[in-house]
């Protein structure tokens, strides 16, 4: 990846479809206190503060594609950029994040 290239992004609609119709992994990197309002059903919760210690829980670098979501997209875009530099070319972030998910009134579950 070019040092100045933007990390790969997917739309909120594509993320929802991935959770509902595929086995694509979606990683929610929000911190536990942010889960109080709910999480997308099927998302795997790995807080950003723990991600470095839990890399083994991610799909292997270059393997099946996976998505990273946070509250607005800022942290997830940053994390995907870092993951890409570590060889996780299969990672993309979700545009809009969980705040937009909630605005759409899409289903969420309590962790």
Question: Positions of the model-derived regions?
Answer:
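Rhodanese-like catalytic fold shared by cysteine-dependent sulfurtransferases
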Residues: 1-24, 32-65, 74-111
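Short, surface-exposed ligand- or partner-binding patches at beta-edge/loop junctions that are enriched
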Residues: 69
């Amino acid at each position: 990846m070019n040092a100045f290239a933007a990390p790969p992004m997917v739309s909120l609609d594509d993320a929802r479809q991935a959770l509902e119709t595929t086995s694509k992994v979606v990683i929610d990197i929000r911190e536990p206190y942010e889960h109080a309002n709910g999480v997308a059903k099927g998302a795997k919760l790995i807080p950003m503060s723990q991600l470095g210690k839990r890399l083994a829980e991610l799909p292997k670098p270059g393997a099946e594609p996976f998505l990273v979501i946070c509250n607005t997209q800022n942290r997830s875009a940053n994390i995907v950029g870092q993951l890409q530099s570590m060889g996780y070319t299969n990672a993309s972030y979700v545009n809009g994040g969980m705040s937009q998910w909630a605005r759409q009134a899409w289903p969420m579950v309590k962790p």
